[in-house]
Design a protein with these regions (language model features):
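Short, conserved beta-strand element in jelly-roll/cupin
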Residues: 82-97, 101, 109-123
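Conserved metal-binding segment of the jelly-roll/cupin
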Residues: 131-152
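A short, N-terminal "cap"/entry segment at the start of jelly-roll beta-barrel domains
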Residues: 18-83, 171
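Bacterial N-terminal signal peptides
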Residues: 4-16
Length: 172
């Protein structure tokens, strides 16, 4: 897991070096023990997507979020009206994730607590791409793209990396 996490941090950092206006910190560390403890402490009866750490890395921000999603609550498909990309890294569990397509019966769900930008949900996604997701998989979902879990075979635990070129996420 550490190699994958380090690779994701490097990839996100290298892609925006030219856009930096201030020097980045020497490093931001999150150990596997810290990540496991954080996700273990999330409620088991709700969909939890909470920030473990958000860092200003020199001209933009990067958030690392821990997610627990119980099997019986896959949740509706959603869309975040933002330029913040979401990079999922699956830790445990399996399910089917759909991305793209059209959000059917789209409705506002208010502003995101992470970015302050509008969020939307729907009853389903038509014409999207579905894939089975297992531990170790990485899925990159650009901002403003419909996405959602259509089914969960088990409870799932994953990390979301959110590179934020606009600096919308509060540092934590």
């Amino acid at each position: 897991m550490r190699v994958v996490l380090a690779t994701l941090f490097v990839a996100v950092g290298v892609s925006t070096v030219a856009a930096q206006s201030s020097p980045p910190p020497p490093a931001v560390d999150l150990t596997a023990i810290q990540i496991d403890a954080f996700i273990d402490a999330l409620p088991e009866d709700a969909i939890s997507d909470r920030p473990i750490r958000v860092a200003d890395v020199g001209g933009y921000k990067v958030g690392v979020y821990g997610v627990f999603r119980p099997q019986e609550l896959p949740g509706p498909p959603i869309r975040h009206e933002t330029s913040v990309t979401e990079i999922y890294y699956m830790l445990s569990g399996t399910g089917t994730l759909v991305t793209g397509g059209t959000l059917v019966e789209e409705r506002s769900t208010g502003n995101s607590p992470n970015t302050g930008r509008p969020n939307f949900a729907g009853s389903r996604v038509e014409g999207g791409v579905s894939r089975r997701v297992v531990p170790g998989d990485v899925i990159i979902i650009p901002g403003n793209v419909n996405h959602g879990w259509t089914s969960l075979d088990t409870d799932i635990r994953y990390l979301i990396f959110r590179p934020d070129p606009e600096g919308l996420q509060p540092v934590r």
